């Protein structure tokens, strides 16, 4: 029974509809249909009018008192007829072509085929092999040079020029020092200050022998310096001894002069003063008798 029912269904619905493959044209309804807003943006047009039935109840309070003038104008749809598209109306009269501007064409009338100049056909210069003849060329002709053919000298000419440049000696002017120019004039304080600020003279050739590194490593220069210092000290010592001898001689001469001045004073002393040592002598002679 089940199989028979399936066979009947298969025969009745053998060809399935192809609604998914193509869209059938919808029949035009004669009922009035609400047109969409002119701006094609929902919520921006026809807000000044009373809200329709389709609008939600919240749209009644769409515009608030706290909104600025710009926001109120935007919520009401902006300026009137700002986003509306008007279809072009019917033309009155035949269409007229645009007039061509003066800067676009060279002549008021287009030139005919006879008036047109035939363009001169010329082959590029790099495709023509023709030797240059200066007699035939005009005075304004300038020979073209490639980017690498500026130097047209041979190797021998270039080497000769390099040797000549090496042989040439540059003569510098003589250096005149400021001190030599001012030798005859008296030196002032200002001149001395300027001379102090002047640059040092150029170093001349060294007269001394070059340094010997073996002698430098073995402290030979140190020994020479010590010997030189010792010789200088030996030269200074005799001068100091002579100075000490001269001071001693001056002191001896002063002492002798003081003794000479004291001797005449002793000669002028009275006779009583001369006998005093004799009076004092007897007690000295009596001392040994008492001791006996």
From Swiss-Prot:
Query: Per its UniProt entry, which superkingdom is the organism in?
Result: Eukaryota
Comp. bias (Basic and acidic residues)? 221-239
Keyword Lipoprotein tagged: no
What about PTM? Phosphorylated upon DNA damage.
Identify residues that carry Phosphoserine.
Answer: 50
Q: Which Pfam families match?
A: DUF5524
- The question of whether Phosphoprotein is a record keyword is answered with yes
Keywords from the UniProt entry: Phosphoprotein
Q: Where is the composition biased (Polar residues)?
A: 176-189, 208-217, 240-250, 260-270
User: What are the annotated disulfide bridges?
Assistant: none
Q: Which portions of the sequence form the region Disordered?
A: 29-50, 166-292
Q: What is this protein called?
A: Uncharacterized protein C7orf57 homolog
The protein's organism comes out as Rattus norvegicus (Rat)
């Amino acid at each position: 029974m089940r199989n028979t029912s399936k066979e009947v269904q298969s025969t009745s619905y053998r060809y399935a509809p192809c609604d998914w493959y193509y869209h059938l044209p919808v029949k035009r309804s004669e009922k009035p249909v609400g047109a969409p807003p002119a701006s094609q943006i929902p919520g921006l047009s026809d807000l000044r009018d009373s809200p329709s039935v389709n609008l939600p109840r919240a749209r009644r309070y769409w515009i608030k008192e706290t909104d600025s003038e710009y926001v109120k104008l935007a919520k009401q749809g902006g300026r009137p007829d700002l986003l509306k598209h008007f279809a072009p109306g019917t033309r009155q009269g035949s269409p007229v072509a645009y007039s061509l501007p003066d800067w676009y064409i060279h002549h008021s009338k287009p030139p005919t085929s006879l008036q047109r100049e035939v363009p001169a056909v010329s082959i590029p210069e790099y495709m023509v092999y023709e030797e240059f003849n200066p007699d035939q060329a005009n005075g304004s002709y300038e020979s073209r040079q490639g980017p690498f053919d500026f130097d047209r000298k041979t190797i021998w000419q270039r080497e000769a020029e390099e040797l000549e440049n090496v042989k040439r000696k540059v003569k510098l002017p003589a250096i005149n020092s400021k001190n030599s120019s001012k030798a005859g004039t008296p030196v002032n304080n200002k001149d001395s200050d300027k001379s102090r600020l002047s640059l040092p003279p150029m170093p001349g050739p060294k007269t001394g022998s070059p340094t010997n590194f073996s002698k430098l490593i073995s402290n030979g220069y140190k020994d020479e310096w010590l010997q030189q210092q010792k010789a200088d000290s030996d030269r200074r010592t005799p001068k100091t001894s002579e100075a000490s001898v001269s001071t001693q001689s001056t002191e001896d001469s002063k002492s002798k002069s003081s003794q000479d001045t004291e001797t005449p004073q002793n000669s002028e002393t009275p006779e009583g003063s001369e006998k005093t040592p004799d009076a004092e002598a007897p007690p000295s002679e009596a001392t040994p008798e008492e001791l006996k």
